[in-house]
Regions:
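Conserved sequence/active-site signature of Rossmann-fold short-chain dehydrogenase/reductase
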Residues: 3-4, 61-64, 120
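Catalytic helix-loop patch of NAD(P)-dependent Rossmann-fold dehydrogenases
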Residues: 4-60, 69-77
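C-terminal substrate-binding subdomain of Rossmann-fold SDR/epimerase-dehydratase oxidoreductases
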Residues: 81-219
Length: 219
């Protein structure tokens, strides 16, 4: 997860960007997971049962399968922004809260790197293929999985409205503890080594998310 970078001092982040202290319990657990995987690889390196590992640092996965038959189905209150958007648009939720509009960004809202879930799935296939086919150059490798393009929360909301012809009821709320101001990926390493690159646009992805929400509602 990209949360391992914490509040990065230089953007975009590469795989060599230092990991700073996590800004949330979620980010802390992701750092722990990477440490466990790395240590397992190191501990077994000289044994007959040597383990190899690839860590994919996801940025912000969004969207659904283009068929609208597979998508994100949160239990209870969603943890991610796009299900909040689609549930507000469909009428499940009365109002969308945008947490913070006083950040040091162009429109005052946080910047994120939103990647289509189908592109993310393809990154997994590329990583597994690299491992199975013996193309890893190290026993433990790390890849950023994002688009390399920062999009603000407000831009994402506006894009959803424009692409889907839906007007959202939203309000600005106080900042949420643990949210970093901005994070987006340098994906050159994944592009070169995995032969993978994000292909779907934010607009296509938001259209797929809305199609999925309507499918759930039987519309």
């Amino acid at each position: 997860s990209a949360t391992v970078y914490g509040e990065a001092e230089v953007l975009p982040v590469t795989e060599q960007t230092p990991r700073l202290p996590a800004t949330s319990p979620y980010g802390n657990t992701k750092q722990m997971c990477e440490d466990i995987l790395r240590d397992t690889v190191l501990a077994t390196a000289a044994s007959d049962g040597a383990v190899k590992g690839i860590a994919l640092r996801y940025f912000n996965p969004i969207g659904a399968h283009p068929s609208a038959l597979i998508g994100e189905l949160p239990r209870g209150v969603p943890n991610n922004l796009v299900p909040f958007i689609t549930q507000t648009a469909i009428g499940k939720r009365e109002c969308l809260s945008i947490f913070g509009n006083d950040y040091d960004t162009a429109d005052g809202t946080c910047l994120r790197d939103y990647i289509d879930v189908v592109d993310l799935a393809k990154a997994h296939v590329a990583a597994v293929s690299r491992m199975v086919e013996g193309r890893m150059k190290k026993d433990y490798e790390i890849f950023n999985v994002g688009t390399g393009r920062p999009v603000s929360v407000y831009e994402l909301v506006s894009a959803f409205e424009k692409v889907n012809g839906v007007k959202l009821n939203y309000r600005f709320a106080p900042r949420r503890p643990g949210d970093v101001v901005a994070i987006w990926a340098d994906t050159q390493f994944a592009n070169d080594e995995l032969g993978w690159k994000a292909e779907r646009s934010v607009e296509d992805t938001l259209a797929s998310a809305w199609a999925w929400e309507k499918h759930l509602a039987g519309k």
